[in-house]
Amino acid sequence: MADKYIVEEAEALAKRALHSPIAQATPIYEQLLSLYPTSARFWKQYVEAQMAVNNDDATKQIFSRCLLTCLQVPLWQCYIRFIRKVYDKKGAEGQEETTKAFEFMLNYIGTDIASGPIWTEYIAFLKSLPALNLNEDLHRKTALRKVYHRAILTPTHHVEQLWKDYENFENTVNRQLAKGLVNEYQPKFNSARAVYRERKKYIEEIDWNMLAVPPTGTSKEETQWVAWKKFLSFEKGNPQRIDTASSTKRIIYAYEQCLMCLYHYPDVWYDYAEWHVKSGSTDAAIKVFQRALKAIPDSEMLKYAFAEMEESRGAIQSAKKLYENILGASTNSLAHIQYLRFLRRAEGVEAARKYFLDARKSPSCTYHVYIAFATMAFCIDKEPKVAHNIFEEGLKLYMSEPVYILKYADFLTRLNDDRNIRALFERALSTLPVEDSAEVWKRFIQFEQTYGDLASILKVEQRMKEALSGKGEEGSSPPESSLQDVVSRYSYMDLWPCTSNDLDHLARQELLVKNLNKKAGKTNLPHVPAAIGSVASSSKVVYPDTSQMVVQDPTKKSEFASSANPVAASASNTFPSTVTATATHGSASTFDEIPKTTPPALVAFLANLPIVDGPTPNVDVVLSICLQSDFPTGQTVKQSFAAKGNPPSQNDPSGPTRGVSQRLPRDRRATKRKDSDRQEEDDTATVQSQPLPTDVFRLRQMRKARGIATSSQTPTGSTSYGSAFSGELSGSTG
């Protein structure tokens, strides 16, 4: 719908019509005004084109179509020019028609802040009327005084100039009476001038040339919407403290002007109609709703609001027609439900029941209709048996809908029918897909916590864990019981058996365990190339165990961070791209939870890693290996090196393995290689018969034992100098 409302194309068409002959311009204007019927600028351009060729009949027809819906001063000035052109040469009859036209115009737009020139023109026209005798002169002066009084009470741009003209007028007529009249109207003028200054602030924020298009959420549209809301609120406050009739007139004028720009905004139409209802003018509200549905025919909101107003004032047949109109335009479950409720209110139970029997046969009927009618029968008609039968009938069709199961369970709970509730849960959980059964399991547990004993509660919880643990991957074992289960079991509404800090701690632990178990066993270390391919093609990314992180102070730049480390550099280079890919292709919810447990110091450290040119490993594979590795603690490392000598420096890029080998004598290293050769066959058999170790150092020894001869002849391998996430050194060759 919004595709046809292209402002740039409309402006281009208007410009083309402006320079085209009237025969070619007319269809262009008609096309424009069919899309933008409240554009006073396009109407003015159209009518001026007809006036230029003296096509008076077409001009009158155009004015009859636009004047009352486009309350803008330039368009109405064009109207008064046309009237004066037609009637100026018709003598007294023409003067009378012109006077009526001025009064008609000021009755509609006389409260506009830009209407000052119209007041001035009207006063000048009255002064120009001939006075053949004293009575006519007196009548003319009385008419002028009345117009002046109306003009100086209107907060317009020309209010001060009109006040000066009024003072001169009174002094010219009668100096003795002038002082009394001027003093009487001075406070009223001061009030109008003060209101004008405030009014001007709101008017200046409004773009009067804005074309009415359906809302698209642009900043300009929102700004204009806010500006109009402020202006309407200002006018509703009656800042000038004028009488109710005059204030109502100004508010109506403000709403009509607002609709020229916000013609496709249903909230503006609704506010306008509601204001009429609160003001006691229901007939005016009906007209507003009728215009609104003509402007936005697809708005169900406005149709429901209109039907509600008609029903509230007792116009049942009018409301029924509106509901039937909704059903005819878009037959959906919501329309069925709302019509059911209306029939129940307006015509009784039997009418609603009869319609339900027809509605359930409709292709657009869903489980919502069954729930709504069953609830209506139970709550309003006090017929639990009827409601139970409706739920049972719907269960045959919607057993696979978790929401329907839960609503049925709620109904049985209100009946205190615990036997049928258990039967319902068992029936539903035996047929529901695992991925759709989580909420039903939770409700089953809540039910057991209320109606069952401890054994039944624990049994259902265990069944839920076993059922839901297998929905992700085959062979996964059900999660073990945790303190989180106890908290869930013994909490009630917003009451918890622990503090908020305990809850946060348990939540973090649950997240870490979830991340650890999620990918445990998926990466097959002897087949690293296959693992690389699977990680690259999958949107599920393995994340590190953040609980074992070593806090890094970013203010202290160590040699490890500053060294030309290809692995660390690759982590620095690929980490943002990995993050972006994860957030784009999936697992966004899991990834969003990781930064919550990442220390700020580590984030700063990763951001400051230098960029190094060279080959970069796949970060996902490196992290998956590190995640499954059982790194020795600091105390274990110290004890290990205490037996062999001083531990190597953490700043040594060669790692602990290289540091030890450099301090061993040559013959010791040779002996070590011979021992490895002699045990190669035994080690190979042992490795093949045992599961792969999770220790990266043991894995390195296994690979070294397998390929020591090849690696000694052809130096191919890789060395990992540490994990950018843990801060510990590791080495591997193979």
Curated annotation (Swiss-Prot):
Residues 637-734 are annotated as: Disordered. It comes from Arabidopsis thaliana (Mouse-ear cress). The lineage of its organism: Eukaryota, Viridiplantae, Streptophyta, Embryophyta, Tracheophyta. InterPro entries: HAT (IPR003107), Rna14-like (IPR045243), Suf (IPR008847), TPR-like_helical_dom_sf (IPR011990), TPR_rpt (IPR019734). Homodimer. Belongs to the CSTF complex. Forms a complex with cleavage and polyadenylation specificity factor (CPSF) subunits CPSF30, CSTF64, PCFS1, PCFS5 and FIPS5. Disruption phenotype: Impaired antisense-RNA-mediated gene silencing (e.g. suppression of overexpression of FCA-mediated FLC repression). Delayed flowering and female gametophytic lethality. The keyword Nucleus applies. Residues 664-677 have a biased composition (Basic and acidic residues). Residues 709-734 have a biased composition (Polar residues). HAT repeats lie at residues 20-52, 54-85, 93-128, 139-172, 198-237, 246-278, 280-312, 314-345, 347-379, 382-414, 416-450, 474-505. One of the multiple factors required for polyadenylation and 3'-end cleavage of pre-mRNAs. Required for the targeted 3' processing of antisense transcripts that triggers transcriptional silencing of the corresponding sense gene. GO terms for biological process: antisense RNA metabolic process; embryo sac development; mRNA 3'-end processing; negative regulation of DNA-templated transcription; post-transcriptional gene silencing; regulatory ncRNA-mediated gene silencing; RNA 3'-end processing. This is Cleavage stimulation factor subunit 77. GO terms for cellular component: nucleus. It is found in: Nucleus. One of its GO terms (molecular function) is mRNA binding. SUPFAM superfamilies: TPR-like. Keywords: mRNA processing, Nucleus, Repeat, RNA-mediated gene silencing.
